[in-house]
Swiss-Prot record:
Residue numbers spanned by region Disordered: 1-20
Ligand binding (ATP): 372-379
Gene name, Swiss-Prot/TrEMBL: lon
Domain Lon N-terminal positions: 25-219
Name of the featured protein: Lon protease
Chief localisation class: cytoplasm
Induction of expression: By heat shock.
Reported function: ATP-dependent serine protease that mediates the selective degradation of mutant and abnormal proteins as well as certain short-lived regulatory proteins. Required for cellular homeostasis and for survival from DNA damage and developmental changes induced by stress. Degrades polypeptides processively to yield small peptide fragments that are 5 to 10 amino acids long. Binds to DNA in a double-stranded, site-specific manner.
Species: Koribacter versatilis (strain Ellin345)
PROSITE patterns (UniProt xref): LON_N (PS51787), LON_PROTEOLYTIC (PS51786), LON_SER (PS01046)
GO molecular function: ATP binding; ATP hydrolysis activity; ATP-dependent peptidase activity; sequence-specific DNA binding; serine-type endopeptidase activity
Compartments where found: Cytoplasm
Cellular component GO terms, alphabetical: cytoplasm
GO terms (BP aspect): cellular response to heat; protein quality control for misfolded or incompletely synthesized proteins
Length: 814
C-alpha cells in the first residue's frame, strides 16, 4: 500500500463520538506494554516503520501510542491494534548500535483512534480525547482508594524488585483515576490485556474496582511465592540463582492456573521443532535452547535472539523435498528447447546430468558454471533447468559481495545477526533440493572482512556440503541435494580452488541468424505482451529485425535487441493510444523512423579506416563477447625508434616487439630497404586508448600492419585476422575462436584469417549457417597471412579499390 489514505474505523462496542478535539498524529504501535497517562515509559523502537516515525518528528514531539493485540505480529495493521491508546510526548531519543532507537515517552491523556489516514511508511491516525467519568466524592470511592494504597504498599514491601519509592509516590497522588494509572503501570506482573482493559475504562470508580481485584490477586501470588521459596530454598545453590527465580515463576503460574506469553511461545515453538523432522543432534540443540527460552523473562535481552534462532531451526526444510518424482527426460528436453534456441552443447550436458540423476537419485550433484557474455541466457537457463526438474528456483547475486558473513552468516553474538544468503535461500525455497543459482560469481570481492569466495568452497564441494555449517545456525545442514548453478562473464577472476569445484559450460554469443530466430520466437512475443500489444496490431518483417541487429546493436547476446524491439512496441502503443493507427507493419524504414539514425556502422567503418596503408583489422575476445580491433602503424623520420600506445599490456607489447623483429629480419624478402629502420621511427597505436588491452593473439595483425605500412599496400577490404606469431614466422593457435568469428560477422567482415590449428575449434563450435557469407583462411606461417591480407599485384589493388568504393557508395560498381 502506498501513501494513500485509508478510511479504517474501529467497531469497538465502547466507541462513542462525543469529543470535538480530534487531531491527526503519527501512531506508534507497541507490543507487550501499555502506556498510561502521566507515566514515563522507555521504549525500544526497532521496526523500520517505527524508526521512520520517530525520525520524522519535528518540533512537535506529540504522538499516539497504541498497544498490539498480539505481540507476535511483526507488521501490524489497524485491525491488530486496540482502539484506545495514549497521547504521548517524546522526551528523549537515543540511537543504539544496531540502528534501533531507545525512546522515552510520557503519556498525557487517553485517546480513541477514530480513523487511520495513512499506513505507509508509518501510521497516522485521527484521534479524540476519551473523557473520564469522575464520580462525586463518596465514602465508597474513598474506601476503594485507600484499599488500593494499602494493597500496593504491601506488594511493594514484599517484592524484591519494586522500589520503596513507589509507595511514597502513590501516597502523594490524590486523584483516584491518576492513582489507578500509576499503580497499573508500576506492576510488571500485570498482563498487557489487563493493562489495556484498565486503560479503556473511563469510569474512575470501575477502574478502582478493577485495580483492587488485580492487587488482591497479586498479593495472594506474592504470599504463595514466599511459601514456595521456603520449600525450594534448601535445594537450590547460590550459583543457580537465575534458575531458582525461574522455578519460582513457573510454580506461581502453576498454582494460579495461568500461562504467560513466553510460556505459550515456548509451547508453540516446541510443536514446530517436533514437526520439523530435524536430525537428532540438531533437535537436541533446539530443545536445549527451548529450555533456556522457557526459563527466560520476555524482557531479557537474549529472549528475542534465542526465539529467532529456534524459529530458524524449526522452519528450515530438513526433510522436505520437492517431490517431483521420476525425471521425464523427453519432457525436460522439450522444456529446454521451448525456453532457449540452439545452445545444443549446453542442453546435451544438462540432459546427461538429468539422465544420470534418474538412474541414481542419490547421486552427488555437479556444480555447473555457465560462462559467457551478458545477454546469452545464463540466468534464464537456470530457471529452465528448475522447471524441467520440477523444483523450486532460488537466485542470489554475488556481484559486489565483500563480506564472508553474507555467505556463511553472522555469529549469534552480533546484534541483528542472521544466517547467510545460502541458508536464507533454502528457507525461501521451502525444500532441501532447489535449483540454487549463484549469479555473477566472478564479481565477488574481498577485503578486510574476509573472502566470500573462500566461504563458497564448502558449499560448492559435493564431498563436504552434506554438512554445511552456517555461522548463525551452528548446526550442520545437508546441501548435497541442492543443484548449484553459477554464472560468470569471465573465469579469470574466480580463484583456482573454487573454479576447480565447478564444471565450466561455455555459452558463447549468437550469430545474426540465431538472433533473428530468437527475436521472432521469444523477444517479439514477450515485448508485445509487456506493452499490451496483440499480434494483430504489429507485424515485424525479417528485414526490419536484421536492420536492428546490424545497425542498432553490436553485442554477443540479445539484450539490446530486445530493448530496441521494446522501443518499437512502445512507440506503436503510443500511436494506437493517440488514435493515429490501429496496425503497424514494421519495415526497415519504420525502424529508422522510430529508432533514429544508425548507431553501428557495419562494413563502412572497416572499409573507410583501412583505405590507408598501415591500418589492419584484428579480432579480440572480451568478457562481453568478441570484438574487432584496429591496429594502426605510421612512420616518421628519426633514428630507429619504436613507440607503442593504446593502454597495452606487457604481453601485447612483447608481441609488437616480436612483430617488428620479424619484419626487420625479413625486410629483403618483403622488398623493404633495410636502412629504412635506421633513419625512421615507427609508431604502432591500438585505438580506444581508454580501454586496457593485452594478450598475444594480435601478433599477425601487427606484422601485417607494419608490412602494409612499409610496402604501401592497404589491407584488402573487409578482412580481419587473429593469431600469435613466433620469431621464425609461425602462426600459433589462439582462444575465443567462436566469439571472435561472430564478432567479425557482426562487423561486416567477409574474409577471416585464422591459425590452422584452430580449424578443429571452428568445426566443433560453429555451424555452416553461422559461417555463411564468410570466407575463412587457415594459415601456418606469416607469409601465408601476408599473401591473403595484402594485394600482390596492381590488378588486385584495383579490384580492392572497386570493392571498397562499392561498400562506401563512392563510385558505381564496375
Amino acid at each position: 500500500m502506498a501513501n494513500e489514505a485509508h478510511n479504517i474505523e474501529h467497531t469497538d462496542p465502547e466507541f462513542r463520538d462525543d469529543s470535538a478535539d480530534a487531531r491527526t498524529l503519527p501512531l506508534l504501535p507497541v507490543r507487550d506494554t501499555v502506556l498510561f497517562p502521566h507515566a514515563v515509559l522507555p521504549l525500544t523502537v526497532g521496526r523500520e516503520s517505527s524508526v521512520q516515525l520517530i525520525n520524522s518528528l519535528g518540533e512537535d514531539k506529540t504522538i499516539v501510542v497504541v498497544a498490539q493485540r498480539e505481540a507476535r505480529v511483526d507488521s501490524p495493521q489497524p485491525s491488530d491494534l486496540f482502539a484506545i491508546g495514549s497521547l504521548a510526548v517524546v522526551h528523549k531519543v537515543v540511537k543504539m548500535p544496531n540502528q534501533s532507537l531507545f525512546v522515552f515517552a510520557e503519556g498525557l491523556e487517553r485517546v480513541r483512534v477514530t480513523e487511520y489516514v495513512q499506513l505507509n511508511p508509518y501510521m497516522r491516525a485521527t484521534v479524540e480525547t476519551v473523557p473520564e467519568a469522575f464520580p462525586p466524592k463518596s465514602a465508597e470511592i474513598e474506601a476503594l482508594q485507600r484499599n488500593v494504597l494499602t494493597l500496593f504498599q504491601q506488594i511493594v514491601t514484599g517484592s524484591p524488585t519494586l522500589s520503596d519509592e513507589l509507595s511514597t509516590v502513590a501516597m502523594n497522588i490524590e486523584e483516584p483515576g491518576r492513582l489507578v494509572d500509576f499503580v497499573a503501570s508500576s506492576l510488571p506482573s500485570l498482563s498487557t490485556k489487563d493493562k489495556q482493559e484498565i486503560l479503556e475504562t473511563a469510569d474512575v470508580q470501575i477502574r478502582l474496582d478493577k485495580i483492587n481485584q488485580h492487587l488482591a490477586k497479586e498479593l495472594e501470588v506474592q504470599q504463595l511465592r514466599n511459601k514456595i521459596q521456603s520449600e525450594v530454598q534448601d535445594r537450590v545453590q547460590q550459583t543457580q540463582r537465575e534458575y531458582y527465580l525461574r522455578e519460582q515463576l513457573k510454580a506461581i503460574q502453576k498454582e494460579l492456573g495461568e500461562q504467560d506469553d513466553s510460556t505459550r511461545d515456548a509451547d508453540e515453538l516446541r510443536e514446530k521443532v517436533e514437526a520439523a523432522g530435524m536430525p537428532d543432534d540438531v533437535k537436541k540443540e533446539a530443545l536445549k535452547e527451548l529450555g533456556r527460552l522457557a526459563r527466560m523473562s520476555p524482557m531479557a535481552a537474549d529472549y528475542s535472539v534465542t526465539r529467532n534462532y529456534i524459529e530458524w531451526l524449526a522452519v528450515l526444510p530438513w526433510q522436505k523435498s520437492s517431490g517431483a518424482g521420476e525425471i521425464d527426460i523427453p519432457k525436460a528436453k522439450d522444456i529446454l528447447d521451448e525456453d532457449h534456441y540452439d545452445l545444443q552443447k549446453v542442453k546435451d550436458r544438462i540432459l546427461d546430468y538429468l539422465s544420470v540423476r534418474r538412474l541414481k537419485p542419490n547421486m552427488k550433484g555437479p556444480i555447473l558454471c555457465f560462462s559467457g557474455p551478458p545477454g546469452v541466457g545464463k540466468t534464464s537457463l537456470g530457471k529452465s533447468i528448475a522447471r524441467a526438474l520440477g523444483r523450486k528456483f532460488v537466485r542470489i547475486s554475488l556481484g559486489g559481495v565483500h563480506d564472508e558473513a553474507e555467505i556463511r552468516g553472522h555469529r549469534r553474538t552480533y546484534i541483528g545477526a542472521l544466517p547467510g544468503q545460502i541458508m536464507q535461500g533454502i528457507r525461501r525455497a521451502e525444500t532441501n533440493d532447489p535449483v540454487f543459482m549463484l549469479d555473477e560469481i566472478d564479481k565477488v570481492g574481498r577485503d578486510f572482512r574476509g573472502d566470500p569466495s573462500a566461504a563458497l568452497l564448502e558449499a560448492l564441494d559435493p564431498e563436504q556440503n552434506n554438512s554445511f555449517r552456517d555461522n548463525y545456525l551452528d548446526v550442520p545442514f545437508d546441501l548435497s541435494k541442492v543443484l548449484f548453478i553459477t554464472t560468470a562473464n569471465q573465469l579469470d577472476p574466480i580463484p583456482e580452488p573454487l573454479r576447480d569445484r565447478m564444471e565450466i559450460i561455455d555459452l558463447q554469443g549468437y550469430s545474426e541468424e540465431e538472433k533473428v530466430h530468437i527475436a521472432f520466437r521469444y523477444l517479439i512475443p514477450r515485448q508485445e505482451e509487456e506493452n499490451g500489444i496483440t499480434k494483430d496490431m504489429i507485424e515485424f518483417s525479417e528485414e526490419a529485425v536484421r536492420r536492428i541487429i546490424r545497425h542498432y546493436t553490436r553485442e554477443a547476446g540479445v539484450r539490446n535487441l530486445e530493448r530496441n524491439i521494446g522501443t518499437v512496441c512502445r512507440k506503436l502503443a503510443r500511436r494506437i493510444a493517440e488514435g493515429k493507427t490501429e496496425k503497424l507493419a514494421v519495415t526497415p524504414q519504420t525502424i529508422t523512423e522510430m529508432l533514429g539514425g544508425e548507431k553501428v556502422r557495419v562494413d563502412t567503418e572497416i572499409a573507410e579506416r583501412t583505405k590507408r596503408a598501415g591500418v589492419v583489422v584484428g579480432l579480440a575476445w572480451t568478457p562481453a563477447g568478441g570484438d574487432i580491433l584496429f591496429v594502426e602503424a605510421t612512420t616518421m623520420k628519426g633514428k630507429g625508434g619504436f613507440t607503442m600506445t593504446g593502454q597495452l599490456g606487457d604481453v601485447m607489447r612483447e608481441s609488437m616487439q616480436a612483430a617488428l623483429s620479424w619484419v626487420k629480419s625479413n625486410a629483403g624478402k618483403l622488398g623493404i630497404d633495410e636502412e629504412f629502420f635506421e633513419k625512421h621511427d615507427i609508431h604502432i597505436h591500438v585505438p580506444a586508448g581508454a580501454i586496457p588491452k593485452d594478450g598475444p593473439s594480435a601478433g599477425v595483425t601487427m606484422v601485417t600492419a607494419l608490412v602494409s605500412l612499409l610496402t604501401d599496400k592497404p589491407l584488402r577490404p573487409l578482412t580481419a585476422m587473429t593469431g600469435e606469431i613466433t620469431l621464425s614466422g609461425n602462426v600459433l593457435p589462439i582462444g575465443g575462436v567462436k566469439e571472435k568469428t561472430l564478432a567479425a560477422k557482426r562487423a561486416g567482415v567477409k574474409t577471416i584469417i585464422l591459425p590452422s590449428e584452430n580449424k578443429m575449434n571452428m568445426d566443433e563450435d560453429l555451424t555452416p549457417e553461422q559461417l555463411q557469407g564468410i570466407e575463412v583462411h587457415y594459415v601456418k606461417t606469416i607469409d601465408e597471412v601476408l599473401e591473403i591480407a595484402l594485394p600482390s599485384n596492381k590488378a588486385e589493388e584495383k579490384q580492392d579499390a572497386r570493392t571498397r568504393a562499392e561498400v562506401l557508395n563512392e563510385v558505381p560498381a564496375v
